[in-house]
């Protein structure tokens, strides 16, 4: 730590401190010079503006007199004389515009959109409505046809068919209801409880079936089927004992017996 102040790059070194102070003083001088130039430029610009303003005020009466004698300034219009005389003006086709107006008026009258003051909608239409037409002789009266619903409602044959359909539906519902009631009564009829002898026989049958299934499973695990009434004999010879297969007992096999004559 004592060597650190003697390094040339140390911030507290005398040379470095003097260099920093010299740079700061130079920066301050440059900033002052820049501000002086800005103020000088602003002063010159203001002086020039005031000079131009004074010249403009002195020459204003002369300009007003010159403008009074000269024509008005503006864009040059080469066709002003033609427009004043009415030449070169594009005019539309009056006949075509009149035909379009009449066609539009006819369509609006047919639709009932265009009506004049004091005119009804019926008068505005090109054809009077059907209720204002006189009835023709020997033909059907104008207007909509008689209501078909009223005729069908007053038809006696249709009424008879409707009553017959309701009767058949009612009879079918009664037949299905009677069958359902009969089946429900049979299902709800309580059954006779079994006797004790029947329950005991079923229990013994279940126990015998479970016992035989357990014996068959053990025999399959050990790799051989037990004969009924024959007790299982344990193999004492390790070389003849079956291979142990904990997870796949059906794949366990007995080792192959070797011929004693071939071994010697």
Curated annotation (Swiss-Prot):
Region: Disordered; residue ranges are: 1-37, 49-76, 118-264
Other comment: Belongs to the leukocyte receptor cluster (LRC) present on 19q13.4.
Might you report a single GO cellular component term?
Answer: nucleoplasm
Annotated positions of the Phosphoserine modification: 59, 245
**Compositional bias (Low complexity):** 59-75
Here the segments flagged for biased composition (Basic and acidic residues) are 12-37, 146-162, 170-214
A Pfam family of the record is: Cir_N
Recorded superkingdom: Eukaryota
Q: What is this protein called?
A: Leukocyte receptor cluster member 1
> What SMART domains does the entry give?
Cir_N (SM01083)
Q: Gene name on record?
A: LENG1
Give all cystine bridges in this chain. Answer: none
User: Which keywords label this protein?
Assistant: Coiled coil, Phosphoprotein
Coiled-coil ranges per UniProt:
16-46, 89-115, 196-222
